From Swiss-Prot:
PROSITE patterns: G_PROTEIN_RECEP_F2_4 (PS50261), GAIN_B (PS50221), SUEL_LECTIN (PS50228). Proteolytically cleaved into 2 subunits, an extracellular subunit and a seven-transmembrane subunit. Residues 25-114 form the SUEL-type lectin domain. This is Latrophilin Cirl. Residues 1673-1689 have a biased composition (Basic residues). The gene is Cirl. It comes from Drosophila erecta (Fruit fly). Residues 709-754 are annotated as: GPS. Belongs to the G-protein coupled receptor 2 family. LN-TM7 subfamily. One of its GO terms (molecular function) is mechanoreceptor activity. Residues 1-767, 823-828, 897-920, 990-999 are extracellular. Residues 561-754 form the GAIN-B domain. Glycans are attached at N142, N256, N302, N341, N398, N655, N703, N730. Residues 1491-1505, 1515-1528 have a biased composition (Acidic residues). Residues 275-285, 295-304, 384-394, 1458-1483, 1651-1672 have a biased composition (Low complexity).
């Protein structure tokens, strides 16, 4: 196939090889045209009129029209000169007419002299320039006139690299349309030995040709010759075909080994008069096999050859019709007053310049990627396209790949759908087009006798009114520079200084005006006629020309002067200053000189003086408008020297990947400020001693970022940042500092308007991962905070807990602010607030980490190692330092520069300036270094302590602190990794760093690990929290029933042993039996052998699990406790019957009890009044442990035996009538007292005997088994809420199975009483007179009624225990190891409701008010019995009894006023006797002041006296604590608590007494011991204060009275001990405590029932009571006594998670 030449004939080709000439003739003159002999004239174009102001204008008239044209000028000339050797035509209106009257016209003719033999085919169509074709050897070997098509030939050797070819590559290397080898024939036989072959005029490369046969294609319907074919059909049967080459066998194996794998299309335009842009389609796959179609190989199919160029099928047989073929051609269009015809992709259309300008215009057609529409899949198959069938003959060439070639061609066709032919650049290249008048000015300026002022003036006038082309811009700037150079020599010819200055100033004015005209908007198209490189060159020439002319004037001025030239687009200022007058920096421009911009440049005084010359400083300032639209950043485009393209989205076609996978996403940078210039006379562009300061206003404030201070480099014609730095920036302005002078501006990145958040730099996967990571971390932080809040009962309010709460809050704020900030734009005000708060949160978080490390260090170096309590002053100091310092630093930063939070690219970062490093980086580093330093010091201290001999509890606490420090250190390192990775990722993404993604994924991983670490090591690892999680989840209604435990379940546990044997769990339970406490089972009742089993040690988790209401597995077998006394350990005997808790020496406490679903976390509330006869059991051979079953209905039971009481032997052997009664579930409570040695001494601070928490972790409680906490607390119940408990009935079910009729009757009676009690309670609530009464009623416990005759005698101990009685009591007294027992005197508890009901439990569940848990009492520390051990005797007790009988009883140092009050003399006598006999007063080294109020009345003064005496005894005890520590260590007992705890307990005791006495006096209660609080009446000795009452009778007797009563009790029942019931119900007569829980209506009824007779009767009865009552009388009120209803005091207790019994005494009514 032989193509023809586009749009021209061969004759035209020869004509263009001739010289191109132009002739002019002014109006009235003759135009003569002549050619050489043998040649004739060939006219190209002609015009009679005026296109230029400079031609035929000797006088410089600028008023003539330059758009004057006679349309038939060419026809007139052709009639006179066409095809002639010479001719002459008169340029006159008589010949051509007058197209523009008043304008002096001229005749212009463009012609060529061609051979006379070619005149027959010459046409008037404009022809391409002469270098389209070039001379060379014969094109056809056989002499035919056909031109060989491009791309056919043996192929030249591959060049070392892909060259940048000119716009039209000529033959034999010369410019031309085709690149044909010199030795070329019509038919060639070659193998693809070269991967680079010129095609389509050298535009498409990378084609290795195979054997081809050329044919001339059919003519086109539009009359134009068809374009040369890029791909050729293979004719297997043509006559000229010679041995076709098979690619599968002939291709060399390494033919394409050097080809890269990708293909990049680079498009551009030429410059400097030639088209040196290229369309590069090189680089094919290096992994081609010989059996596959290589680049440019022949793919057989349907009898046609499908030639591919790097998998791009530009033209194939599969394409049919004009639509497919038109994709390879750019359509015709009009641009710059020229018509551009259809042009093939890769070719350059060339034609003459428009409007009378000399030169040629060029425009390239390229194949560019089409922007895909939304929802359009660019690789979807065309539904209309069909895949051609493959013939069997085609498969013979490659049977293994018969179908793939067709599929590959189809795929290539689909890829071509995404590309379209496009004219590039957007406007034609008119760099070579020059107006004729500018050529005339250029010639004039080079003449010696020309007037420079006239030339400059003509240039300024023409540029302001005429349209310029690209070449005109080059000529104009060249003239400006030439004028300045000539004026530099010509000024010496003017002897007068003023004349010289005037001439140069006029020249400068014309030059500035010309420059402003070039920058005007009307000349924008002229700038676009230039390629980007030429634009930069012209701009540089304009700037230097203006500067040269300005300094020409500055050098002429010899005195101080300032000249300002202000035009539309340029402000120029020339200043000549004397150095002596320079007092400060010089600023340009003035505010009133340049209103177009607020830009400002400031030159320091020192820099000016250093560059002075002759005492004068010459400065040139310039400010430009619209220059920023020309001086574009060059590195935004591709390499201009090789491609000259500014197309950012370049298509990359890969052989192995999709097209869009290789799209280049480059950063788009713009010049975002006006250009401002400054130069000094000496050296002009020199380094300055001091930098200058520039303030530049941003032209665009939205969607721009990353400002950079740059200057224009004259050498490279590009912007450079060397020597300039950004000082500060905000949304509208930037401040720069540079150490040299030139033209300055601001470069900024453009952010996509549709995606302007931080996530625009994330790919899809990373964005999802960041969301997930932050979400996980936030969830776990919230869980940690909720754990601290919901399960606050588990934790001690310590400094460590407060620190970690603050850390969690700071981390939560940081995560949320980061997530919110990365979605915001960097230009919004809200973004600034996010950055501010994030700054503060990070500083606070790092500060809290530092304080946490410091707290661990201080714990190890102080006495806080063994006692972790709330340290409010220290925590407050932490709060002040953390948040105070953080807010102060942020405030200082805001005051210094508020814009630092709004000028950065992202909302989560500050701008990296000096303020950022001073207010953010430095404080964070200081806190982190301090935290690491304190952690290192803590490790050193722990290593030293581990080598020293410490007590067991100290080692335990040290291990806990060591674990906390390890966790904190890992936490700190993990948090540092999170923040560092986030910072480096953001910075890297900002600079398009390749490592940004690595940091991004590191941030995702570390942030996720941070959340998991918080949850695991700060929540899950703490066994207390795990237990609370189980309880919290299982006790809520939103869970299925299968996951929740029964609300009626009973949890219990027993801890026995000391030391290694501590923590032994001993219990037995069977499947679905009565829910008895641990230690009770039916096997234990029936099988004595089972009771002899050895205890089974169990871990802390199992112990706590057994005590949880959800952990009791009723189907499991539990063992009972082995009998006997272990060495050094007191243990329960085998007679452990009826659920109870055994407390042993040195052990912790576990208690049975129902855990209500409404119980607060970490507590087990004990509920009393289960139906069971009262029992008192002595456990073990020493009878150390007791248990009690408070029985609400025991007074209803018929008496059995002697008075319904068992003998001591019956109790001990579990015989008698009670033995046959069913054993029912019940709940009791005990509390421990701190063991103490016999001798006391002063002990050191901080050595309080608080064993370590089982977990020993972060949230360890300081309360332990040896600590008893007293709370005045109550629970508000809802109206109509039942108070019965279903476990009562459940506990009675098993006896029914045995057929016990008595048990069944007992159960029925109990159920009826409960129902009656519930009904009466509801009626009482309905009778409430107001809402206030109802609230008060709900806020108190149930009403209790004292019933006479319900108390039973204390059972005597077994006979074999008598010999151990004295030793046991003495040891128990010395060690203060006692049990609070409810076995005696339950008349105080077994009382009915207010209405006299018989049913209902005695107690409701009591919820502790956690806010009131502020008083911690150590019962063991309240050891006042040692003070009165030898001083208080029987006489004191008798005197106290006599005083009580006389009506002058004192309680706690205060007056108990009933019917009468003791006199002042009796009080003084008792006080004096007490002080004389007190052993504590003799050993007292100091006195403790009481916290009593001096403003109390006379009765309160007496209370203060007793309180002071009590404090004396406590203070005396401090001196002996040091000695007690030694004995504590010897016995393995925990040491005593510190002095503060004892003082607090004493003050609470005194406060209780005062309130109680006021209540008695308020109601006028008689002196009845039954009405006294616990310990007020005569009682036997009890070892330890209980329920906030220290015991004692009156002032002179405190603990001695207990000893007296204990001796009296021992006389009746050896080994008997007074229980709590006796403490609260003293004596056998007198009214009970006033009912504090009565409603106002009930109180009024009670007051109405009171009468003087009853009061007198009570007083009389009390006065005749026996001063030394029998123990039986102490616990039994008179059968006929009917006490009035006074305030009653109720007692309850709960066991917390730290084995601490919390006893609750009902608060007194106000």
């Amino acid at each position: 196939m032989l193509p023809t030449i586009l749009s021209i004939s061969y004759e035209h080709t020869y004509a263009y090889l001739s010289k191109y000439q132009t002739a002019y003739a002014c109006e009235g003159k003759k135009l003569t045209i002549e050619c050489e002999p043998g040649d004739v004239i060939n006219l190209i174009r002609a015009n009679y009129g005026r296109f230029s102001i400079t031609i035929c204008n000797d006088h410089g008239n600028v008023e003539w029209s330059v758009n004057c044209m006679f349309p038939k000028s060419l026809s007139v000339l052709n009639s006179r000169c066409a095809h002639k050797q010479s001719c002459g035509v008169l340029a006159a209106t008589s010949m051509f007419g007058d197209p523009c009257p008043g304008t002096h016209k001229y005749l212009e003719a463009h012609y060529q002299c061609i051979s006379a033999a070619q005149t027959s085919t010459t046409t008037n169509r404009p022809s391409p320039p002469p270098w389209v074709l070039s001379n060379g050897p014969p094109i056809f070997g056989n002499g035919s006139g056909l031109i060989h098509p491009p791309g056919i030939g043996a192929g030249a050797p591959p060049p070392p690299r892909l060259p940048t070819l000119p716009g039209v590559v000529g033959i034999s290397g010369n410019p031309g349309l085709f690149n044909v080898p010199p030795q070329h024939t019509a038919v060639t036989h070659s193998t693809p030995s070269s991967s680079t072959t010129a095609m389509a005029g050298g535009r498409l490369k990378g084609v290795a040709t195979s054997t081809t046969t050329t044919k001339h294609p059919a003519g086109r319907h539009d009359g134009l010759p068809p374009p040369p074919q890029l791909h050729h059909h293979h004719n297997h049967h043509g006559e000229d075909t010679a041995s076709p080459t098979k690619p599968s066998s002939k291709l060399p194996a390494g033919g394409n080994a050097t080809s890269p794998s990708n293909t990049r299309i680079l498009t551009g335009v030429g410059g400097s008069g030639t088209d040196d842009g290229t369309l590069l389609t090189t680089k094919s796959s290096p992994n081609r096999t010989p059996g596959t179609a290589a680049s440019g190989s022949v793919v057989p199919g349907n009898g046609s050859v499908v030639r591919t160029i790097n998998n791009i099928n530009l033209n194939s047989a599969g394409m049919s019709g004009g639509d497919d073929e038109s994709k390879l051609f750019c359509g015709p269009t009009h641009a710059r007053n020229l018509y551009w015809n259809m042009t093939r992709v890769g070719d350059v259309n060339v034609q003459p310049c428009p409007g009378g300008a000399a030169g040629i215009a060029k425009w390239r057609c390229v194949l560019m990627k089409r922007m895909p529409d939304s929802g359009y899949d660019e690789y979807d198959d065309d539904p209309s396209s069909t895949t051609p069938a493959t013939s069997s003959a085609d498969c013979l060439h490659n049977s293994s790949s018969c179908e793939p070639p067709v599929s590959m061609a189809h795929k290539v066709n689909q890829r071509l759908r995404n590309f379209e032919p496009t004219w590039h650049p957007t406007t034609p290249d008119l760099t070579q087009c020059r107006s004729l008048w500018l050529n005339n000015l250029e010639m004039r300026v080079n003449q010696r006798d020309s007037s420079l002022i006239s030339i400059a003036n003509d240039m300024s006038e023409v540029t302001s009114s005429k349209t310029l082309y690209g070449g005109d811009m080059l000529v104009t700037t060249k003239i400006i520079q030439t004028v300045s150079e000539k004026m530099l020599h010509d000024k010496e010819t003017f002897p007068d200084q003023r004349q010289r200055e005037a001439m140069i100033m006029e020249l400068l004015h014309c030059v500035v005006k010309t420059g402003s005209n070039l920058l005007d908007e009307s000349q924008l198209s002229s700038w676009l006629d230039l390629n980007p490189e030429d634009q930069m060159r012209v701009a540089t020439s304009l700037l230097t020309g203006l500067e040269y002319n300005a300094f020409l004037l500055a050098d002429t001025i010899i005195r101080e002067r300032s000249v300002v030239q202000k035009v539309k687009n340029i402000l120029l200022s020339v200043r000549v200053l004397e150095t002596k007058t320079i007092q400060s920096s010089v600023v340009f421009p003035d505010s009133d000189q340049w209103p177009l911009s607020s830009d400002r440049i400031e030159l320091p005084r020192a820099a000016l003086i250093d560059n002075s010359e002759g005492g004068l400083v010459r400065i040139v300032f310039a400010a430009f408008d619209r220059l920023e639209s020309i001086l574009k950043p060059s590195y935004d485009h591709f390499d201009l020297k090789s491609s000259r393209s500014y197309v950012r989205n370049t298509a990359i076609l890969s052989n192995d990947s999709d097209v869009n996978a290789g799209e280049i996403q480059q950063r788009l940078r713009i010049l975002n400020s006006k250009v401002i210039s400054a130069s000094l006379g000496k050296g002009r562009h020199i380094q300055l001693s001091q930098p200058i300061t520039l303030t530049l206003k941003h032209l665009k404030t939205e969607n721009v970022t990353n400002p950079t201070c740059v200057f224009w480099n004259y050498i490279d014609h590009a912007w450079s940042a060397n020597g300039c730095s950004l000082e500060s920036t905000n949304r509208t302005h930037s401040v720069c500092s540079c150490n040299h002078l030139t033209n300055f501006a601001i470069l900024m990145d453009v952010v996509d308007e549709h995606q302007h958040s931080l996530f625009t730099m994330f790919d899809g996967n990373m964005r999802i991962f960041i969301y997930i990571s932050i979400g996980i971390c936030v969830v776990f932080i919230v869980i940690a905070l909720l754990t601290l809040k919901l399960f606050n009962g588990v934790f001690v309010k310590s400094a460590r807990t407060s620190i970690y709460t603050s850390i969690y809050l700071c981390l939560l704020a940081i995560e949320l602010l980061f997530l919110l900030g990365i979605e915001q734009t960097e230009t919004s005000i809200f973004c600034g607030f996010i950055t501010i708060f994030l700054h503060c949160a990070i500083l606070s978080g790092t500060a809290w980490f530092c304080y946490e490390a410091f707290h661990s260090y201080s714990t190890l170096t102080s006495d806080e190692l063994l006692l972790e309590v709330d340290q409010t002053p220290k925590v407050n100091c932490y709060y002040l330092l953390s948040y105070g310092l953080s807010l102060s630093v942020v405030a200082i930063s805001l005051v210094i520069d508020p814009s630092t939070y709004t000028q950065n690219d992202y909302c989560v970062l500050m701008e990296a300036n000096a303020l950022f490093y001073a207010t953010f980086v430095m404080p964070v580093l200081v806190f982190f270094v301090a935290a690491i330093g304190y952690t290192f010091l803590s490790w050193i201290i722990m290593c030293r302590k581990s080598r020293t001999g410490l007590k067991t509890k100290e080692h335990t606490r040290l291990a806990s602190v060591r674990f906390d420090i390890r966790c904190s250190f890992v936490f700190l390192l993990l948090l540092s990794a999170v923040w560092c990775s986030a910072y480096f990722y953001l910075r890297g993404a900002k600079m398009d760093d390749d490592t940004a993604d690595v940091y991004g994924y590191c941030f995702i991983c570390f942030n996720t690990l941070l959340g998991l670490y918080i949850f695991v090591f700060h929540c899950i690892q703490n066994e207390k929290i795990r237990r609370e999680y189980r309880k919290y989840v299982r006790q809520h209604a939103w869970l299925p029933k299968c996951l929740r435990c029964s609300k009626t379940s009973i949890s219990s546990g027993i801890v026995t042993g000391n030391g290694p044997t501590a923590g032994t769990l001993c219990s037995v339970s069977t499947s679905k039996k009565p829910k008895l406490p641990i230690g009770v089972s039916e096997e234990a009742h029936d099988d004595p052998q089972q009771q002899q089993q050895t205890p089974v040690p169990i871990t802390e988790d199992a112990i706590m699990g057994a005590s949880s209401d959800c952990e009791l597995n009723e189907a499991q077998q539990r063992r009972t406790l082995k009998s006997g006394l272990m060495t050094g350990t007191l243990q329960a005997p085998p007679q452990t019957l009826g659920g109870h808790v055994v407390l042993e020496r040195g052990s912790t406490l576990r208690s049975t009890g129902h855990a209500s679903p409404t119980s607060s976390a970490g507590s087990t509330h004990l509920i009393f009044a289960h139906k069971q006869q009262q029992q008192q059991q002595q456990q073990g051979p020493l009878g150390e442990s007791y248990y009690h079953q408070p029985d609400y209905y025991s007074w209803k039971q018929p008496p059995t035996g002697t008075g319904g009481l068992k003998t001591p032997r019956e109790y001990y052997n579990n015989t008698g009538a009670a033995a046959s009664s069913p054993q029912q579930a019940h709940e009791v409570f005990y509390w421990t007292q701190k063991p103490n040695s016999g001798q006391h001494g002063k002990k050191k601070r901080g050595a309080g005997g608080v064993p370590a928490s089982p977990s020993g972790s972060l949230h360890s409680r300081t309360a332990a088994a040896s600590q008893v906490l007293f709370y005045p607390s109550y629970k508000k119940t809802k109206a109509g809420q039942p108070t019965g408990y279903p476990q009562y009935a459940e506990a009675l079910d098993p006896p029914l199975a045995t057929g016990n009729a008595a048990a069944y009757y007992q159960q029925q009676q109990q159920l009826r009483r409960q129902q009656l009690h519930l009904q009466q309670q509801q009626q009482q609530q309905q009778q409430l007179s107001s809402d206030e009464e109802q609230v008060e009623q709900h806020a108190h416990l149930l009403q209790l009624q004292r019933r006479a005759g319900s108390q039973q005698q204390l059972p005597a101990p077994p006979p074999h225990m008598a010999q151990y009685q004295q030793e046991f009591m003495q040891r128990q007294y010395r060690n203060k190891q006692s049990n609070c027992d409810l076995g005696m005197g339950d008349a105080y508890y077994n009382q009915g409701s207010v209405g006299g009901a018989d049913g209902g439990p005695v107690y409701e569940e009591i919820l502790s008010n956690r806010n009131s848990d502020v008083q911690h009492y150590e019962v063991g520390d309240f050891d006042v019995d040692e003070v009165y051990n030898n001083s208080v005797g029987t006489g004191v007790f008798n005197n106290m009894r006599a005083a009580v009988a006389a009506g002058g009883s004192r309680y706690g140092g205060g007056s108990l006023s009933g019917g009468s009050v003791s006199s002042r003399s009796q009080q003084q006598q008792l006080k004096k006797q007490q002080q004389q006999q007190s052993l504590a007063q003799q050993r007292s080294a100091r006195r403790c002041t009481a916290d009593d109020d001096d403003d109390e009345d006379e009765e309160e003064d007496e209370e203060a006296t007793a309180a002071e005496q009590l404090h004396d005894s406590v203070c005396d005890e401090d001196e002996e604590e040091d000695e007690s520590d030694l004995e504590d260590d010897a016995h393995g007992l925990p040491p005593q608590s510190d002095e503060r705890m004892r003082r607090l307990m004493a003050m609470q005791d005194e406060d209780f007494k005062r309130r109680f006495q006021r209540q008695l006096r308020k109601h006028g209660a008689p002196l009845d011991y039954g009405a006294l609080p616990p310990g007020a009446g005569p009682q036997p000795e009890h070892n330890g204060a209980v329920f906030g009452v220290s015991g004692g009778v009156g002032e002179g007797s405190k603990r001695g009275a207990f000893r007296q009563q204990q001796q009296a009790l021992n006389a009746k029942s050896p080994g008997g001990r007074l229980a709590v019931n006796d403490l609260f119900g003293h004596g056998n007569s007198g009214p009970p405590l006033p009912p504090a829980n009565q409603t106002p209506a009930q109180k009024r009824q009670q007051l109405q029932k009171l009468s003087p007779q009853s009061t007198t009767s009570s007083s009389s009865h009390t006065s005749h009571s026996n001063p030394n009552p029998h123990p039986h009388q102490l616990t039994h009120p008179h059968p006929h006594q009917h006490p009035p209803h006074h305030q009653q005091r109720h007692l309850s207790a709960m066991l917390d998670e730290n084995n601490t019994v919390r006893c609750y005494l009902e608060p007194l009514a106000k």
